[in-house]
Amino acid sequence: MPIRALCTICSDFFDHSRDVAAIHCGHTFHLQCLIQWFETAPSRTCPQCRIQVGKKTIINKLFFDLAQEEENVLDAEFLKNELDSVKAQLSQKDREKRDSQAIIDTLRDTLEERNATVESLQNALNKAEMLCSTLKKQMKFLEQRQDETKQAREEAHRLKCKMKTMEQIELLLQSQRSEVEEMIRDMGVGQSAVEQLAVYCVSLKKEYENLKEARKATGELADRLKKDLVSSRSKLKTLNTELDQAKLELRSAQKDLQSADQEITSLRKKLMILQGTLSLPPATNETVSRLVFESPAPVEMMNPRLHQPPFGDEIDLNTTFDVNTPPTQTSGSQHCLPKKLCLERARSPMQNVLKKVHKVSKPESQLSLGGQRCVGELDEELAGAFPLFIRNAVLGQKQPNRTTAESRCSTDVVRIGFDGLGGRTKFIQPRDTTIIRPVPVKSKAKSKQKVRIKTVSSASQPKLDTFLCQ
């Protein structure tokens, strides 16, 4: 078994790979560890017992005799020493690695700082270049402005000289002879004075020509204004004449308007009288029937006949048409239809008369001032609008007085009665029954006459078969 001794300095077991040294006190250490101890310690003492040690008292190397069979056997202490040395190396490597990693991190930080510095310097360089280009442009602009300023100064100096010359010319034009002579004397003698005098002479000549032209233009303007004044006076005279004529026309128009108002008033009164005259007063159906049958047949009720086509086209007689046959009617309705048509035709002139009466009663602004119509023309027009039986029965009577007609119109009564054609109608019944004189006929004779007239009228009316035969 090997000696299980260890070095108290490095705590490693003794082996044959390193030398073992001893001190005179008897303690043993690794030679390398003992030398390093003496170099680092403040005094040369034993690391274990602290006794003073001299250089001569140190045994540098001890020799141990080992057995032959034990040389090839691995010792646990040796392996432990190797393991400790490997661990120490590993820890050293780890420490070196950590130091290297710290150095690498430091270098990386330094590199990033340098990159940031380079980037900032690059940005600063770009800004400096932009600033330099801007300054160059500004310098160029300032040089241009300087040139413009120089030109402006020259122009200002030239204009100042010109203004001074103009002031002198103005003074020359406005001043008296003595002042002009004094100014000429102040000019002195020389080429510049001669040039100045020449300029003054040219300016005076131009001013004289301008004054001549202005005088000529002023004379022409005065002549034109005189002519305009004469023409304006003549126009004013004409307008005054026209104004007087217009005033006269206005007065005549006012007189015409007053006469038209009087005419409208008279026409309204006559219209009221005519409305009272045209009222049908009888309360019996016999008078209406008599007036209807006494009237001649209207033009529209003539016998129908075939006419020439309007456009001259030929008619194809072979063409067939679907004609809807009306239902058969009773004899009473067939007899009453023509009379009803006759009554409707007879009523149409009455409607036209009412329309004409409404036209007469329009506002005064629609009447023409110059075109007046007399009363007789209106009466003739109204009389021509009525059918013959109305004129014979009503208009043929004597015109009653205006006061009686107005009193009669105010006492008339509107009634509803039979119209003699199977229907009802409204009529105005006057209180004075002497307007229409009914024919004195007995009641039985009236009924017989009515039946006979109905048969005659129905027989005289055209039929469909006679129309087709024609």
UniProtKB/Swiss-Prot annotation:
Autoubiquitinated. The keyword Transcription regulation does not apply. Disruption phenotype: Early embryonic lethality due to proliferation defects and excessive cell death. TRAIP knockdown substantially increases LPS- and poly(I:C)-induced IFN-production in mouse peritoneal macrophages at both mRNA and protein levels. PROSITE patterns: ZF_RING_2 (PS50089). Pathway: Protein modification; protein ubiquitination. Signal peptide: none annotated. One of its GO terms (biological process) is protein ubiquitination. Keywords: Chromosome, Coiled coil, Cytoplasm, DNA damage, DNA repair, Metal-binding, Nucleus, Repeat, Transferase, Ubl conjugation, Ubl conjugation pathway, Zinc, Zinc-finger. One of its GO terms (molecular function) is ubiquitin protein ligase activity. The keyword Disulfide bond does not apply. Its EC number is 2.3.2.27. A motif (PIP-box) lies at residues 461-470. Gene3D superfamilies: Zinc/RING finger domain, C3HC4 (zinc finger). Belongs to the TRAIP family. Interacts (via PIP-box) with PCNA. Binds TRAF1, TRAF2, TRAF3, TRAF5 and TRAF6 is part of the receptor-TRAF signaling complex. May interact with CYLD; the C-terminus interacts with CYLD, however the interaction was not detected with the full-length protein. Interacts with POLK and POLN. Interacts with UIMC1. This is E3 ubiquitin-protein ligase TRAIP. It comes from Mus musculus (Mouse). The gene is Traip.
